[in-house]
Structure formats: C-alpha cells, structure tokens
C-alpha cells in the first residue's frame, strides 16, 4: 500500500511538471527566417526588425548583409535564404530568369536617389555636380560596378553626365556602398557617389547634390521569396509587414521614396512552391 501511494505521488508530480513546462516550451519554439539584404538596408532593418519580431513571436530573423550582386550569386550557388532584399530590383529579375524566385512574390517596396557626398570634416571644394566639370578633384569614390548595384548606377550617371572621361583617372573603387562611405569619411576620397539611403543616416558624410533622375535607371528596392525558402509563411508575413503603411512611413526616415507597388500583398496561398 505504501509503495502504491509513493508511485501515485510520483505520477502526480510528473503530471504537474508536464502541465507546467510543456506549454512554455511550446511557446518558446520559433522558426528562423533568413534574409539576404543589401548593405544600404542595415540602418533601416536595425529599427524595423524588432517590431516585426514582436508582431510575429514565432519567427526569429537572421540577416546576411552584402552587396546585392554578391548576395544574388550566393543564392544562385544554393545559399539557404528565404527572402532576398537587393537594392536594385533587377537582381531579383536575374534570379527569376533562372527559376529561383517563387512566382508572384516580387514587390517593389521603395525607391531612392543617387547623391554626391563629401566629408563634413574635410569638405571638398565642390558644391554641386556641375562643379566637377571645372574644379579639380584628387579622388572620387564610387562603387565597383562588378560587385555592387550602386557602382552600376553611378557608372550610368557619370557616363550620362559626360563626366566619365574627365574623372576616370581619379576613381577609387569601393566593393560596396559602405566601403564608398568609409573612403569619404576617412578622407581617402574628397567626393563619393552613393544612394541617399546610404548617406542620410551617416554623420561622417554630408550630401552635396542629387543626380538627375534621368541620368540613371530607376533605383527600385525590391523583395521576393527565394524558391528554396524553408520558412515560406514567415517570408510572406515579412513582405506584408514591409509593404504596410506604418513601415512605409518609417522607411522615409532612411531616405526611401514611397513604395510603387502596394497591390497584391503576399498571402500564404500565393507563395507555395
């Protein structure tokens, strides 16, 4: 009888432990969401992601930052990515041509402009883009068009403005936008050409002028779900969050223009591979 009571007590204690701990353990389970994002999105995502995660507690976000072209190549090579956030939507199109994007998930969530920057500590003798035609510049930092989208767009601008022949010998190339910012901030280049989204929150540089919109292809920030995505549900939730009016207002603080694509928010049924 004594043994029976002891076993009964142990059973009740085990049941109580199960009732207390199992729900908490279940709630603690989260699913990772891997995002490959352009370097120019660092500041914006640092603000936005905590909000997204608080709204979706079952999702834990992991971000891989880098130049858009490099991230695209990693995805082509099979990198485990759920969501692709390049700074030029055409990088998504390149993946789409290879069948690496889930149909119907590409959206344009914002745009920006191309700007001329200098260091506030060691300012360049120029004030506008037109000054580059007459005032000598020792070094001008631009993105490498082979590795970065900002380099491709800057090359278009310099060619359109007919500044390329004059300034080409003064170019200092940065692998990506952050590298261009660093070259200017450290005084290794007097002038730099970057996206407004890169420069607007960086206290180490100052915006001098904006390149005419017609001097380069539109700078459209896009998002899409990668074909091999493991967390499709979380990816769809993130795109809806990105296109929401509240997020759009927040993005303006980081140099983004209003989203051009607000139709057809991603729903779970639309993103099944």
Model-derived features: positions:
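Bacterial N-terminal signal peptides
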Residues: 9-22
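Exported/periplasmic ABC-transporter solute-binding proteins
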Residues: 27-56, 60-65, 69, 73-79, ...
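N-terminal secretory signal peptides that target proteins for export/translocation
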Residues: 1-6
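Active-site phosphate-binding/coordination module
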Residues: 104
